[in-house]
């Protein structure tokens, strides 16, 4: 199927992907560079999505492309669960960059989903460590944390979390204080 046909057929994504994965930005990206994206008519946009994969590093970052290329040329597994020189270099640079006495460990993850689930676990463990009764988690309305069960429990999107039948009674949602709205 040609890209033009896919672009014209807005139902394409609905047909082949679940509702939660259908693109919510109605721009079919043709190319991207730095913090810009272009559609099929070469209209240029600033990419304010800050979403998965590029996460504020931009598209086609030459330094990143070179570094990834260098790593991929080495025929070893590049999982974050194995020791290797790239991991050691990265940890050293990251800790030096953060430069905080009490922030001297790294916890590698491969996605925002994994990070959200780990944060949920750490929040709960920290509360229980301080006091066995500290089970509650307060979340602000309008948040979006992902598509996993834990993430959707933290989010207050009722439409996307209605499938969850055993909601956590210790997760509370409060309105975000929008000071500009009266």
Regions found by a protein language model. Give the residues of each.
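Conserved S/T- and glycine-rich ATP-binding loop of Class I adenylate-forming
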Residues: 1, 42, 137
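Exposed alpha-helical structural elements
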Residues: 8-12, 63, 67, 159
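Glycine-rich, flexible loop/turn motifs
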Residues: 17-18, 23-25, 53, 72, ...
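Active-site-adjacent loop/helix segments that line or gate small-molecule/cofactor pockets in enzymes
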Residues: 1-33, 50
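PLP-dependent aspartate aminotransferase-fold enzymes
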Residues: 92-182
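Active-site-flanking structural segment that lines cofactor/substrate pockets
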Residues: 27-45, 55
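Glycine-rich loop-to-alpha-helix module at the N-terminal edge of alpha/beta enzyme cores
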Residues: 3, 17, 44-130
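Short beta-strand-to-turn element immediately C-terminal to the catalytic PLP-Schiff-base lysine
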Residues: 38-39, 57-58, 151-156
């Amino acid at each position: 199927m040609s890209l033009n046909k896919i672009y014209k057929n807005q139902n394409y994504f609905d047909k082949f992907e679940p509702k939660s994965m259908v693109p919510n930005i109605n721009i079919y990206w043709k190319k991207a560079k730095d913090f810009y994206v272009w559609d099929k008519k070469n209209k240029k946009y600033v990419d304010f999505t800050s979403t998965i994969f590029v996460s504020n590093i931009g598209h086609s970052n030459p330094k990143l492309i070179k570094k990834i290329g260098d790593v991929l040329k080495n025929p070893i597994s590049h999982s974050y669960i194995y020791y290797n020189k790239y991991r050691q270099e990265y940890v050293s640079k990251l800790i030096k960059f953060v430069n905080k006495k009490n922030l001297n460990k790294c916890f590698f993850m491969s996605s925002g989903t994994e990070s959200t689930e780990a944060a949920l676990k750490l929040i709960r463990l920290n509360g229980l460590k301080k006091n066995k009764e500290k089970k509650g988690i307060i979340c602000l309305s309008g948040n979006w944390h992902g598509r996993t069960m834990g993430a959707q429990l933290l989010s207050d999107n009722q439409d996307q979390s209605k499938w969850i039948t055993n909601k956590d009674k210790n997760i509370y949602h409060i309105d975000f204080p929008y000071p500009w709205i009266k």
